[in-house]
Amino acid sequence: PEYRTLRSRRTVHGGGGIQPDVRVESDTTRVSGYMTRMVAQGVYNDFLMEYMDRYRTLLDERYPTYEAFAEGFTLSDDDLGLLIRAAKERKVEYNEEDWTLSKELIRTQLTAMIAQRLFSTTEFYRVMNPRENEPYKKALEILHAWNEQGEQILLGQ
């Protein structure tokens, strides 16, 4: 069967599943073995439980809204040092090269998880999507430029 899209009146063909107009590959180049081992051994959870136990009252006072959190919260290098210590306690061997590769991705993930614990799951994605989700960023780019460039965006991919 053939269908026409509502907005651009493009013809799309049914019968076999959904094929995206634009393919965007996820960037996994910053996911290191060290990071993967930390996640697998529960280090993120250990860190987050300790961090939230220690700082929840301060965080609640300082960031009463997600907007205040997004504007002012930064997970410091000292905070990340606590993560490395938690990894050592879980027998996850430190790897400097892997840490350098994954450090900022880890910082973003932990920031998103802290936002989730303070507010809701929605805020996890409000942190992660604009920073780390390539398909999300590409979709926003296409939608924001749609009126000016329309179908050319899709045809040019």
Regions found by a protein language model. Name each.
Residues 1-157:
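Conserved functional hotspot residues or short segments at active or partner-binding sites
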